[in-house]
Amino acid sequence: MAKRNVTAKKKVVKKNIARGVVYISATFNNTNITITDEMGNVICWSTAGGLGFKGSKKSTPYAAQQAVESALSKAKEHGVKEVGIKVQGPGSGRETAIKSVGTTEGVKVLWIKDITPLPHNGCRPPKRRRV
């Protein structure tokens, strides 16, 4: 029998960051939450699909709320107390995600910014669905 090489898991280094930026990307299929420091270095992230929501349940407001709570609990371990919010996309979890960041204890919201890209009549949109 060949021996298995067992590699040790990297230990997560706790950073002491007071301010962060919460990026909420709400698509029609999923909601991604990424928390960075002010320079843009990623501290932690969470997605609705990564929390066990599958299929159409990933795009629900409840799944977005759970993703925000998961990401903020990880960020609090790194000392994040004040955040700005950048929201992108037209998804259904967008408003709920913003509200749940604001209602989380120990985290103060400094500003909210919408960074959804809007075309100046660029690419042709996909054809209308016929169901």
Swiss-Prot record:
Listed InterPro entries: Ribosomal_uS11, Ribosomal_uS11_bac-type, Ribosomal_uS11_CS, Ribosomal_uS11_sf
Record GO cellular component, one term: ribonucleoprotein complex
Keywords tagged on the record: Ribonucleoprotein, Ribosomal protein, RNA-binding, rRNA-binding
Gene Ontology biological process: translation
Disulfide bonds: none
Alphabetical list of NCBIfam families matching this protein: PRK05309.1, uS11_bact
Family per record: Belongs to the universal ribosomal protein uS11 family.
Protein name: Small ribosomal subunit protein uS11
Phylogenetic lineage: Bacteria, Pseudomonadati, Campylobacterota, Epsilonproteobacteria, Campylobacterales
